[in-house]
């Protein structure tokens, strides 16, 4: 019985699941916007948000812990140099999940996962202010 077992399996082995979310998190940190299925997006939140919280406190130990979870030097550097300071005043809720229809092949629900307050959002808000 699976009573009270949290997390989705996605019909993958634990190593495959771990690698998938490691890669998705690194891509999210690098590009700040990714498109994936809705269940994967919801599960990605559980992996990515604690890493951003970790990046708020820049230390060698925290960088090593983040690297052990991401295995990407570029992602860790961006996480601590850009994202940590950006969200230093925000108490969680760093990701936004936007539903974007269904995939053509199998009708799977798709979603965009983006970082809240990413630079393109700020530029769009400034453009809206200029129009008014």
Swiss-Prot record:
PANTHER family assigned to the protein according to its UniProt record, in alphabetical order: LARGE RIBOSOMAL SUBUNIT PROTEIN BL17M, RIBOSOMAL PROTEIN L17
Family: Belongs to the bacterial ribosomal protein bL17 family.
Assembly and oligomerization: Part of the 50S ribosomal subunit. Contacts protein L32.
Species this chain originates from: Marinobacter nauticus (strain ATCC 700491 / DSM 11845 / VT8)
Stated name of the protein: Large ribosomal subunit protein bL17
Cited HAMAP family: Ribosomal_bL17
Encoding gene, per UniProt annotation: rplQ
GO molecular function terms listed in the Swiss-Prot or TrEMBL record: structural constituent of ribosome
InterPro entries (UniProt xref): Ribosomal_bL17, Ribosomal_bL17_CS, Ribosomal_bL17_sf
One GO-annotated biological process of the protein: translation
Positions of disulphide bridges: none
């Amino acid at each position: 019985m699976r009573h009270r077992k949290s997390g989705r399996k996605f019909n993958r082995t634990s190593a495959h699941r771990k690698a998938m979310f490691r890669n998705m998190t690194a891509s999210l940190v690098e590009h700040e916007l990714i498109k994936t299925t809705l269940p994967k997006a919801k599960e990605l939140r559980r992996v990515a948000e604690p890493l951003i919280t970790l990046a708020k406190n820049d230390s060698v130990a925290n960088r090593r812990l983040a690297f052990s979870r991401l295995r990407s030097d570029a992602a860790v550097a961006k996480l601590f140099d850009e994202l940590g300071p950006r969200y230093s005043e925000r108490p969680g809720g760093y990701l936004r999940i936007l539903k974007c229809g269904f995939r053509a092949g199998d009708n799977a629900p798709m979603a965009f996962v983006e970082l809240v307050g990413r630079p393109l959002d700020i530029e769009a808000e400034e453009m809206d202010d200029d129009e008014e």
